[in-house]
């Protein structure tokens, strides 16, 4: 069960995943920039910006969207499969989960595919595809590319994501994008960092966690 917490921020609660099925090798499904921590309720780590009230990190894939209601109560899962592994420079993760109907939520299928490839000496590039289909209630599809490059004391990262949700309650069919780029240079006497992020007002990721829109 989730610990009760008081939310004093304007961002929604972000509770950690505790189910073993989703925890095993869950790092393969991490997308975007390396986690910097978050000041969100449910996390004890500081936010990337260092400000206590900064938004938590976006999670393109957040497994708590599967088999759990918004209140945290369980929704039955009829069946599911999950495969993770490595082959040479590639890390691959795939899952397919069928969630049972539980009024007012229709029976829903969740699919996730993540491929990441090591490049150069200490860098990686990757892609992720997500698909959620609810019987009679349309679909939500998400596709993204990401890269993290490291050259000694300099590290750079970027990602871009597009969503499509024809029956979304958001205007424009939930079709929008998010993108982020950052750099970090750290030496013994110098620390320089910067970041730029755009999150579209209609960006709609039903299998992830997005703390805010229209950034």
Report each predicted region and the residues it spans:
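Outer-membrane beta-barrel channel domains
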Residues: 1-215
């Amino acid at each position: 069960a989730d610990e009760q917490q008081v939310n004093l921020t304007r961002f929604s609660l972000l509770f950690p995943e505790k189910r073993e099925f989703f925890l095993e090798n869950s790092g393969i499904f991490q997308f975007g920039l390396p986690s910097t921590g978050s000041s969100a309720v449910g996390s004890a780590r500081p936010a990337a910006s260092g400000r206590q009230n900064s938004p938590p990190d976006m999670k393109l894939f957040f497994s708590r969207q599967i088999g759990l209601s918004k209140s945290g109560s369980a929704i039955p899962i009829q069946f599911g499969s999950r495969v993770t592994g490595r082959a040479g420079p590639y890390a691959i993760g795939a899952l397919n989960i069928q969630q049972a109907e539980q009024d007012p939520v229709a029976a829903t299928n969740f699919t996730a595919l993540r491929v990441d490839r090591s490049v150069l000496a200490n860098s990686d590039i990757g892609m992720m595809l997500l698909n959620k289909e609810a019987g009679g209630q349309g679909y939500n599809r998400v596709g993204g590319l990401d890269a993290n490059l490291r050259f000694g004391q300099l590290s750079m990262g970027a990602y871009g994501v597009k969503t499509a949700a024809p029956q979304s309650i958001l205007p424009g069919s939930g079709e929008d994008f998010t993108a982020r780029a950052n750099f970090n240079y750290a030496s013994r006497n110098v620390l320089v960092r910067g970041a730029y992020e755009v999150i579209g007002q209609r960006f709609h990721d039903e299998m992830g966690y997005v703390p805010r829109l229209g950034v």
